[in-house]
Swiss-Prot record:
Origin species: Agrobacterium fabrum (strain C58 / ATCC 33970)
All copies of domain RNase H type-2, residue ranges: 34-217
Record gene name: rnhB
Cofactor binding remark: Manganese or magnesium. Binds 1 divalent metal ion per monomer in the absence of substrate. May bind a second metal ion after substrate binding.
Keywords of this entry: Cytoplasm, Endonuclease, Hydrolase, Manganese, Metal-binding, Nuclease
Name of the protein in its database record: Ribonuclease HII
Family (UniProt): Belongs to the RNase HII family.
Length: 217
């Protein structure tokens, strides 16, 4: 994201979304922090299934083209970039299941998945760029929280794509096991069809009982 001024009013600025770039990473390298990993999660909002986190260290000489916040990409584009990222980057994935989510809350479960994803990288990073307002605790390196990081940092964007595609595939498999809920279609989100299925069949082991409307007062 960068600011540009119109020629006739240089004091007024328009926000222009140019997509993520490698500026955070290169600035960190100038300061002696290298390599840099990006981390992000997928699945904080659904009523069912895990929250999945990924950590990615990109090869600066071989960065896949077209990366962005995974939510802005088509499924086909995400799948294509997933393959490219896996082939060119150092990648680690971790997840927190419904039990942990219900036990400690979704934010802590998400940050813990990020922490484990970072610790699982084959090469330890000198700096971690984490999407959002919070830094994952318990990692043995510097960390920086980047608000809307998946739209600003290519490393975080890559992590968002890996996390999203991984979680979607997990929920597709869950739909084969738990056939009454349609997980393969809505990935656990609270769609009308999913809510009707819960009403008809009750919750299953994948449901987050601390989330409304599953939570009982």
């Amino acid at each position: 994201m960068k600011r540009t001024a119109t020629p006739d009013s240089p004091a007024l600025f328009d926000l222009v979304d140019t997509g993520p770039d490698f500026a955070f990473e290169l600035e960190a390298k100038k300061k002696g922090f290298w390599p840099v990993a990006g981390t992000d999660e997928a699945g904080r909002g659904p009523l069912a299934g895990p929250v999945v986190a990924a950590a990615v260290i990109l090869d600066p000489d071989n960065i896949p083209k077209g990366m962005d916040d995974s939510k802005k990409l088509t499924r086909q584009k995400r799948e294509s970039l997933f393959v490219q990222i896996m082939e060119t980057s150092i990648v680690s994935v971790a997840s927190s299941g419904p039990g942990l989510i219900d036990s400690v809350n979704i934010l802590r479960a998400s940050l813990d998945a990020m922490r484990r994803a970072v610790l699982g990288l084959e090469i330890p990073p000198a700096l971690v760029l984490a999407d959002g307002r919070d830094r994952p605790p318990g990692i043995p390196c510097e960390a920086k929280a980047v608000i809307k990081g998946d739209s600003r940092s290519l490393s975080i964007a890559a992590a968002s794509i890996i996390a999203k595609v991984t979680r979607d595939r997990m929920m597709e498999r869950a739909g084969v096991v738990h056939t009454s809920y349609g997980f393969e279609g809505h990935a656990g989100y609270g769609t009308p069809a999913h809510l009707r299925a819960i009403e008809s069949h009750g919750p299953c082991a994948l449901h987050r009982m601390s989330f409304r409307p599953l939570k009982r007062d």
